Each structure stands twice: as structure tokens, then as C-alpha cells.
Amino acid sequence: MRPFTRETGLAVPLDRVNVDTDQIIPKQFLKRIERTGFGQFLFHDWRYLPDGSPNPEFVLNRPQYAGATILIAGRNFGSGSSREHAPWALSDYGFRAIIAPSFADIFYNNCFQNGLLPVVLPEEAVAELMRRAQEPGYRLTVDLERCVVEDDAGFRVDFAIDAFRRHRMLHGLDDIGLTLQYEDEIAAYEARRPAWLPTTPAR
């Protein structure tokens, strides 16, 4: 998993509340077996018109937000089903962090498992970021080492994050990576473990 320490990039405002996972990545695109390739389908029903052409009214299709890496969203982002494809699609599109007043619990947890940083800020702070992000070229910094969201024009807000999750993100550790930190200890245990102890049979 790619570590996250500090991200400075274009910020795009998605001023909608209760965005659910079916809106993030519609169910008809969930048949892939890889984690990559979902970015092209992100917010599909909003990004594209019925004839398949880009919807010029949707924020991600505006040229000023091309290459954005930080998404600013409304409260309860990621509600609905627990599909892990939602953070996959956001990451594959290029987002590294999402800022919102609140997130659905399962989506929030899935983000950390996939190297995507969800940042909870007060509603008034998110509203101010939405306003600032209307300006072309608006860039924002999300600093996980200092737990700060800031820009070059005086905006600065601290955010809270669980210490264990912060450690995992800073060092790019998923569940397998965490286990491999103890590879030597596991090998030493297996070497000294008596052969007569019961084992789980392989199938």
C-alpha cells in the first residue's frame, strides 16, 4: 500500500450530501477481479449523459479540476452498501484524500485499508473549503504527519485521527504489511513449536 504523509494538490468540491456507494461506483461495473480500472466509472451516472458523452455540468468534467487529488464532499459520504470498490474507484481516479463532515462507517474503514485518507472536518470548515475550491487552480494540503488541512491563503484546520490508523497510513501498511512486520517472530515461533501440537487441517 502506498504511504500517505502529505498531499498537496487541486481540490474539487462535490457539494452533495449522502453520496452512497452505488453513486460512487454503480453496480454494473463491479465484475472486475482487479482493483484497478474502476476510475473511469467513478460517479458514472453523474459524469456521463445517457448517450455516453461527458456531462458538462458535472464538476469532475470541468477543465479546472483535471488532475485533482483531493475531494471535498458533503456529510455522510460513502453510505449504502459495503462494496470496497468505492475506495478503489476513488483511488484509481487519482484521489488521495477525501474531506467531509462525516463518513459512513464501513466506507471510512475501507478507505484506510486501501491507502485513501478520509478526513473529518467541522461542517463550517468544509463549507469554507467548498467555497474556496470554486476558484480555478485552488490547491490544498492535507498533512497527515501534522494532522492539518491548510492552503496558502490562511485556511488551517487540525483534524483528529486514530493513532493506529495514522501509523498504518504513514507507513503504507495494510493487514498483510502489518503481519510481515513480525515475520521474524512468526518464523521463530514456528521453529520452536512442538510438532505434536494440534494444527488446523488443510483442505
UniProtKB/Swiss-Prot annotation:
Keywords linked to the UniProt accession: Amino-acid biosynthesis, Branched-chain amino acid biosynthesis, Leucine biosynthesis, Lyase
Family: Belongs to the LeuD family. LeuD type 1 subfamily.
Catalytic reaction(s) noted: (2R,3S)-3-isopropylmalate = (2S)-2-isopropylmalate
The keyword Lyase appears for this protein: yes
GO biological process: L-leucine biosynthetic process
Pathway: Amino-acid biosynthesis; L-leucine biosynthesis; L-leucine from 3-methyl-2-oxobutanoate: step 2/4
NCBIfam families: leuD, PRK01641.1
Keyword Lyase: yes
One GO MF term attached to the UniProt entry: 3-isopropylmalate dehydratase activity
CDD domains per record: IPMI_Swivel
Subunit structure: Heterodimer of LeuC and LeuD.
Function: Catalyzes the isomerization between 2-isopropylmalate and 3-isopropylmalate, via the formation of 2-isopropylmaleate.
EC number, as in UniProt: 4.2.1.33
Source taxon at top rank: Bacteria
GO terms for cellular component: 3-isopropylmalate dehydratase complex
Protein name, as recorded: 3-isopropylmalate dehydratase small subunit
